[in-house]
């Protein structure tokens, strides 16, 4: 998780819209945005983390310390110029919060590209 934004409607008080990244050499590059998959309790935990760990803000978006790791499920994957990673996930959603993983254990973009057929 590298960016978060507050949701709308019932979720307007919480950070529920997330942007995720993968490693590309020595930097993090965006690969997907996801809005679903966490429980209400997890959303509250992530919101507290975002509030306490925001590094900068631009408009409604908060850049956060890259410490939380999530597993993302998706329907398809392909090359794209939309994300800095050069890859886009189709219909991404949060599968689970990987509390057992540290940020330096996230996938590298080269591993992700191997999924493209």
What is the predicted function of each stretch?
Residues 1-117:
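Classical nucleotidyltransferase
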């Amino acid at each position: 998780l590298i960016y978060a934004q507050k949701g709308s409607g019932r979720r307007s008080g919480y950070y529920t819209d997330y942007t995720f990244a993968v490693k590309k050499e020595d930097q993090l590059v965006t690969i997907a945005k996801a809005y679903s998959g966490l429980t209400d309790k997890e959303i509250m935990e992530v919101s507290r983390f975002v509030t306490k760990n925001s590094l900068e803000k631009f408009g409604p978006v908060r850049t956060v310390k890259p410490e939380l790791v999530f597993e993302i499920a998706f329907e398809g994957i392909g090359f794209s110029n939309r994300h800095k990673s050069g890859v886009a996930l189709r219909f991404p959603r949060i599968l689970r919060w990987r509390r057992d993983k540290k940020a330096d254990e996230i996938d590298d973009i080269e591993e992700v590209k191997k999924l493209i057929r």
